Amino acid sequence: MEGTPNVPQAHRYELTLAGRPLVLETGKYAKQASGSVLVRYADTVVLATAQASETPVEADFLPLTVEFEERHYAVGKIPGSFMRREGRPGEKAILSARMTDRPIRPLFPKGFRHEVQIIVTVLSADQKNPPDILGPIAASAALMLSDIPWEGPIAAVRVGLIGGSFVLNPTLQELEESQLDLVVAGSKEAILMVEAEAGEVDEETLVQALEFAHKEMQPILELQEAMARELAKPKMAWTPPESLPEEEKEALYRLALERGLSQVLQTASKGERSRALAEFAERLIAEALPKGEDGTPDEGKKPLYESAFDEVVRRELRRLVLEEGKRADGRGPKDLRPIWIEVDVLPRAHGSAVFTRGETQVLGTVTLGTGRDEQILDDLGIDETEKFLVHYNFPPFSTGEVRRLRGVSRREVGHGNLAKRALKAVMPKEEDFPYTIRVVGDVLESNGSSSMATVCAGCLALMDAGVPIRAPVAGVAMGLVWEENRAVILTDILGLEDALGDMDFKVAGTRKGVTALQMDNKVGGLPREVLKEALLQAREARLKILDLMEAVLPAPRPELKPFAPRILSLKVPVEKIGLVIGPGGKNVRALEELGVEVDIEEDGTVRIYSSDLQAALEAKKRIEDLTREAKVGEIYEGTVTRITPFGAFISLFPGTEGLLHISQIAPGRVARVEDHLKVGDVIKVKVHRIDERGKIDLIRPELEGKIPPRRRR
């Protein structure tokens, strides 16, 4: 690295992680940001900046945005768009932004309402070490150095499982052979976020992997703490939003219990509960509001009471779970909601299913496509295609709301990716089922756990389509209520329980093991036993769901649906690929006139796609005829194409002809070939010899032994 003499000296903090240098650097770049850190891991480099607005905004939530920006120069490329510049973030960038957002969000102080923006920019990608795990580390370090109040640090690591051993931060090449792709983010005391894709890994191995990850991230946390001790700015002064004094909150809680809050909360239907709760809140707040001397309520305090009422509801829901083992819809902690399933629900879809669990309902569909339907991946520097696609749609009517449809949200991208990871482990190999497969999960109703319902609906739709998956997959969302060393694990959580719990995690898998895991922890460190128990309780629920799914459709259908395309595959010699294509693509165009699509790969693999099986078979026959090679001793029905004084040329199949010498046409002396054969005659001939130049000598099989074969000079 070269520069002028006055280049500022950066502050560097370094350690070795999985045999590669991890460097945190600050003080040289992006110095006007409140916090900025350059993180380098091997030759992958990201820059993270943290900035907060000077004044708070009117909101009842933390206005945090996290952006993950990929620059094509990071891999030495120019963007392929018309404008030749980066556009909207791709799916991988969105998932990386979510991976950074989720572990840092819970660590902002309650009530902090200043806008916070974290931008992680990938400056260099060595295409060996994925940049996504550097996002949480860099964002954490930038926040630690900034004046933004935040209770970090956090760190993130990736864990693989190769040959029965855990591998820390596996490279992209190592991930291809790994049975596990586990990303864990956490603080010193706790695991805060988990994202995992697994090849049917058992629960005990997962717990061990989580412990391994948490142990290995500790040096990264210590490095950030050392940096912050020396360089961190004083934290900005901020004023928490006004709230009711604790004694008034307590009085409101007692009054709510007296007026029957517990009974209102235990209304089975989501809609009825919401309406009853809104009416109850209105009556309760009207009664609880302080009154003036003339009896007029103090309306100025109403927003404070409305906010306090939300805390009252959360407190009572948690009490019901912890002390009475009761949930909002009347279930016990381990109970699943009622489930009903339908398959083959759409007449033209290649596969379809509806999976309904309580008030959550997903329509799953499968479409089978050709090689031309593969998705071109938008990953930074990766020129690959994807044959398995899973898309998740969450329309507003699914929750009884009205809002604009503004394209795919980050949440939809994240949930679709989770469902994809859950199903990917059981998908057939390309050579066994060479289709492009698109699964779509349309959420028709939602009251919690819609991503896991998408896994179930998607799996059933795959089986309905006749996709030979290795095993059925089901998923379930779990929750945890934790207080004073008491833990209650909740199976199949409602949307309401998702908000009140201390940890939510989604587990998908087969009877054999877990294929996908997503976890967000909102409390401190959880004992190993609690994590293990939660995973085992999820397994118990998963097996019950699989029983119900298999009762409807025990295995993939043996045949594809009538409207699904058929694929025929064959292999042609590489040197004959040009013959199949023809001059200027003439032969391929002629094949496509049959109503088929033809894909030809560099190794000579030819795939023929058509919804008309007969058309596909005809196309296959034509290709076989084009690429056939004559074999000595084989008999063919050939057509006379030319007559010469020394014999007749016979076409055995398109592109291949041989010579039937005049001496082999008939017994005795033949004066003129035309006396025995004419152009267009169809006769049986046998390949007698093929010389080193590929020239073919033919004989008539019925005269074999009666006429001595011709000898070449």
Curated annotation (Swiss-Prot):
Disulfide bonds: none
Subcellular location: Cytoplasm
EC top class named in words: transferase
Record's keyword terms, sorted: Cytoplasm, Magnesium, Metal-binding, Nucleotidyltransferase, RNA-binding, Transferase
Gene3D superfamilies reported in the protein's UniProt record: GHMP Kinase, N-terminal domain, K Homology domain, type 1, Nucleic acid-binding proteins
UniProt keyword Ligase present: no
PROSITE patterns attached to this UniProt entry: KH_TYPE_1, S1
One GO location term (cellular component): cytosol
Function: Involved in mRNA degradation. Catalyzes the phosphorolysis of single-stranded polyribonucleotides processively in the 3'- to 5'-direction.
Family from the record: Belongs to the polyribonucleotide nucleotidyltransferase family.
Name under which the protein is recorded: Polyribonucleotide nucleotidyltransferase
